């Protein structure tokens, strides 16, 4: 009987330790394949040879995909570094902080490409932030983009100011 209680206590302790490993940096650490897409609501002013036009539009982001690594910083405070190697494009990195079962993305500067109908693609600087949760082998980032900028599109100059954003990055853990 004492042996059975001892085995049950050891099993319970092992389960407790395993459950603790499912929070914080250990929950997110790994190598992933990611895809980012979404849209922003933006005030858009376009200046060209025909004059100026201004409106508020929902603009699609140019989809990005590639490889992502989420690494512990070793600081013991839940600090992490996220690196994104965009297929055929840039590499970016930013800091995040694991808090329980959430990953908080610290604000970082990046560039985004917006599809503007009839005019082409505008590239502007933004500040991104947000949070993420892990579901099985998938991490879902909900991102917020803020910023404004000017971009040359063919013969036109576009001034873009982001009012709202709906952006997700889905990252699937690689085997």
What residue ranges belong to the model's regions?
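A short hydrophobic beta-strand element
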Residues: 32, 104-108, 134-152
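Bacterial N-terminal signal peptides that target proteins for export
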Residues: 1-9
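Short, solvent-exposed aromatic-acidic interface loops
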Residues: 37-41, 84-92, 144-152
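Tryptophan-anchored aromatic micro-motifs
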Residues: 22-53
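Edge beta-strand at a domain terminus
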Residues: 140-175
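Predominantly extracellular/secreted and cell-surface proteins with exposed
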Residues: 52-135
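C-terminal motif of bacterial Sec signal peptides marking the signal peptidase cleavage site
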Residues: 16-19
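Flexible, membrane-facing loop/turn or short amphipathic-helix motifs
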Residues: 38-50, 111-123, 148-160
């Amino acid at each position: 009987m004492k042996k059975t209680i001892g085995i049950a206590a050891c099993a319970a302790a092992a389960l407790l330790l395993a459950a603790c490993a499912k929070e914080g940096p250990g929950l997110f650490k790994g190598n992933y394949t990611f895809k980012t897409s979404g849209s922003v609501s933006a005030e858009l002013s376009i200046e060209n040879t025909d004059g100026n036009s201004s409106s508020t539009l929902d603009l699609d982001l140019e989809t990005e995909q590639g490889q992502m690594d989420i690494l512990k910083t070793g600081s013991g405070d839940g600090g992490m570094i996220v690196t994104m190697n965009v297929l055929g494009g840039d590499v970016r990195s930013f800091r995040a902080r694991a808090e329980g079962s959430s990953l908080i993305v610290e604000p970082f500067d990046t560039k985004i490409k917006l599809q503007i109908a009839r005019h082409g693609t505008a590239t502007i600087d933004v500040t991104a932030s947000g949070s993420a949760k892990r579901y099985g082998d998938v991490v879902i980032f909900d991102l917020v983009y803020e910023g404004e900028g000017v971009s040359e599109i063919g013969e036109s100059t576009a001034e873009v100011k982001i009012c709202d954003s709906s952006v997700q990055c889905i990252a699937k853990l690689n085997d």
